[in-house]
C-alpha cells in the first residue's frame, strides 16, 4: 500500500479538493492528497462546447453573471495551457466590455510575431488573385516560418508557431463564414479584434496560462480548452511528461477557492472543422 502525504488546503472548498485528489490519484509518483479546511461549496462542473468560439462566449456570459452577483472581476480567472489560447477570450470578453489582465504574456496583438504577421498581411493587400484568401494568408505566414505542423522542439519556436497558427485559424473561420471574403476583409476583422482588447485595468479578470498561475488564487476559476493535444499537450510523449500535464491540471484546479468550472470544445471552428476529443486527464473523474 502507498502512504499518502496529507496536506491541508486552506484555499479550496471540499468539492474542488476532492476532484483535484482524483486527478492526482492516477499519478503513482505523487503521494500528496489534500484535505480541505474550508468545508462545503458548489460542485465543480465540466462542460463540452461545440466550438472554441462558443466556449469563449459562454464563459464570458458566466463571468458577466458572476460579476453581477457581486464577485469582483479581480477574483475571477480563466486559465489555459498555452498563451495563444488567450486571443479568443481577449476578443469575447472585450466585446462584452469586461476588462482583462494578461499574466505572463503580452496581449495577443502586441506580440512581436503577430505585429510582424499583420505588417506582412497588409503588404499583401494589393496582390490580386482568384484563390481563397485563407490560402494567401498561409503563404504569407509561411514566409515568416509558419508550417502546417507544430514544431517538435523549443518553447520559443512553439509559442511563435502557436501565435501564427491562431491567425491561420481565424482566416479559416472567416472563409467558412463568408465565402466571398477577401484579404482586406480579413485584415479589417483582425483590426477590429485588436481594438476590442481593452487597456489593462486594476480591477480586471485574469487570463493566464496554468504555468503563470502557480501560487495564485481566485474565488472563481474557469479552466478552458481541456481537450486532447492541448492538455495534455501534444508533445507530452513520455510517462513523466504526461504526469507533468496531470500535475498542471491539478495546479489549475487548486487555484479556485469556491467556484471551479472546467470546459473543452468539440471542434476548433464553428463549422465543426478541427474535431477534438475530451482530455484523457478527465477520464473517470466523478463530479
Model-derived features: positions:
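RNase H-like polynucleotidyl transferase catalytic core
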Residues: 5, 97-107, 262
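Conserved helicase motor
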Residues: 83, 104-111
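Conserved helicase C-terminal RecA-like lobe
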Residues: 86, 90-98, 111-287
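Helicase P-loop NTPase motor core
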Residues: 1-2, 8-98, 124-126, 161, ...
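Conserved beta-strand edge residues that scaffold enzyme active sites
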Residues: 80, 107, 266-267
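A broad, low-specificity signal marking well-ordered, structured residues that form hydrophobic/aromatic
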Residues: 4, 44-45, 51, 205, ...
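Pocket-edge positions in alpha/beta enzyme catalytic cores
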Residues: 5-8, 47-51, 106-109, 152, ...
Amino acid at each position: 500500500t502507498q502512504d499518502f502525504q496529507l496536506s491541508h488546503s486552506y484555499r479550496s472548498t471540499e468539492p474542488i479538493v476532492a476532484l483535484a485528489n482524483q486527478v492526482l490519484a492516477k499519478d503513482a509518483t505523487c503521494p500528496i492528497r489534500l484535505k480541505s479546511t474550508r468545508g462545503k461549496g458548489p460542485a465543480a462542473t465540466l462542460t463540452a462546447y461545440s466550438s472554441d468560439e462558443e466556449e469563449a462566449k459562454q464563459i464570458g456570459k458566466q463571468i458577466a453573471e458572476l460579476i453581477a452577483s457581486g464577485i469582483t472581476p479581480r477574483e475571477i480567472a480563466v486559465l489555459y495551457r498555452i498563451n495563444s489560447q488567450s486571443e479568443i477570450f481577449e476578443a469575447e470578453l472585450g466585446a462584452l466590455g469586461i476588462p482583462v489582465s494578461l499574466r505572463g504574456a503580452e496581449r495577443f496583438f502586441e506580440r512581436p510575431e503577430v505585429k510582424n504577421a499583420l505588417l506582412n498581411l497588409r503588404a499583401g493587400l494589393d496582390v490580386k488573385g482568384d484563390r481563397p484568401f485563407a490560402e494567401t494568408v498561409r503563404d504569407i505566414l509561411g514566409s515568416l516560418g509558419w508550417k502546417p505542423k507544430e514544431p517538435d522542439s523549443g518553447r520559443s519556436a512553439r509559442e511563435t508557431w502557436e501565435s501564427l497558427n491562431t491567425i491561420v485559424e481565424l482566416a479559416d473561420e472567416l472563409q467558412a463564414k463568408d465565402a466571398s471574403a477577401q484579404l482586406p476583409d480579413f485584415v479589417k476583422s483582425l483590426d477590429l479584434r485588436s481594438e476590442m482588447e481593452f487597456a489593462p485595468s486594476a480591477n480586471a479578470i485574469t487570463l493566464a496560462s496554468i504555468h503563470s498561475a502557480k501560487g495564485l488564487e481566485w474565488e472563481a476559476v474557469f479552466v478552458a480548452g481541456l481537450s486532447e493535444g492541448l492538455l495534455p499537450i501534444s508533445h507530452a510523449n513520455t510517462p513523466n511528461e504526461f504526469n507533468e500535464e496531470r500535475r498542471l491540471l491539478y495546479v489549475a484546479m487548486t487555484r479556485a477557492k469556491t467556484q471551479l468550472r472546467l470546459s473543452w470544445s468539440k471542434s476548433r471552428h464553428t463549422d465543426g472543422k478541427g474535431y477534438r476529443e475530451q482530455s484523457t486527464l478527465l477520464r473517470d473523474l466523478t463530479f
